[in-house]
């Protein structure tokens, strides 16, 4: 309960402008979930099991997000050991690198000093079929099915905004007599250059079923 987490939604951030971002995000694979309840800008969601690529990063939250993103993006874009076909070629080799489709979300959990940054892997992969990371800092993990209370908002997701929205979500959880099981997870769906009113941000707290 003492740990904080950040969820960074990553979806094709290379060479994309803010104007083009909306349609692209809608076509990016995201973890499967069912909406159990909706109350204005808050939802209760049941998420299916998922596989993530994770790396640990020390430091301030924003700095750690950037470093962790770059580390796992390297794995996504080919810094891995694969026995599968390399896209755009016909070769099959143990030393070939494989590009993995970008998905949403990427998660980051931490205690304020160390953050565990996670990319969600495409659903068509298993832990056996995913290429192995070349970088030992990247780990592949399975995440069990979970239920979350989620609040959605636009604008800049600065510390004060995150604090205020977290308090709003906490109040909702208490009003429903729900049992929180985790600290907040911050979800970002847009690249840094996206205009505030185009941004989609979420805060997620795991709750008991």
Show where each model-derived region lies.
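A solvent-exposed interaction/effector surface
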Residues: 2-209
């Amino acid at each position: 309960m003492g740990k904080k987490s950040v969820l960074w939604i990553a979806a094709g951030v290379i060479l994309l402008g803010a104007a083009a971002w909306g349609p692209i995000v809608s076509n990016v694979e995201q973890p499967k979930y069912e909406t159990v309840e909706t109350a204005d800008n808050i939802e209760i969601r049941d998420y299916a099991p998922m596989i993530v690529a994770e790396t640990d990063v020390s430091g301030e939250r924003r700095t750690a997000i950037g470093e962790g993103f770059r580390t796992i993006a390297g794995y996504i874009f080919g810094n891995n050991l694969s026995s599968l076909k390399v896209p755009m070629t016909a070769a099959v080799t143990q030393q070939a690198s494989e590009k993995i489709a970008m998905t949403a979300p990427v998660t980051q959990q931490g205690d304020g000093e160390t953050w565990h940054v996670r990319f969600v892997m495409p659903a068509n992969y298993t832990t056996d079929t995913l290429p192995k990371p070349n970088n030992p800092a990247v780990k592949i993990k399975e995440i069990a099915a979970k239920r979350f209370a989620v609040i959605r908002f636009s604008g800049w997701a600065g510390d004060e905004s995150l604090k205020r929205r977290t308090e709003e979500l906490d109040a909702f959880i208490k009003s429903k007599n729900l049992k929180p099981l985790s600290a907040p997870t911050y979800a970002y769906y847009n690249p840094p250059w996206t205009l505030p009113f185009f941004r989609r941000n979420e805060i997620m707290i795991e709750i008991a079923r």
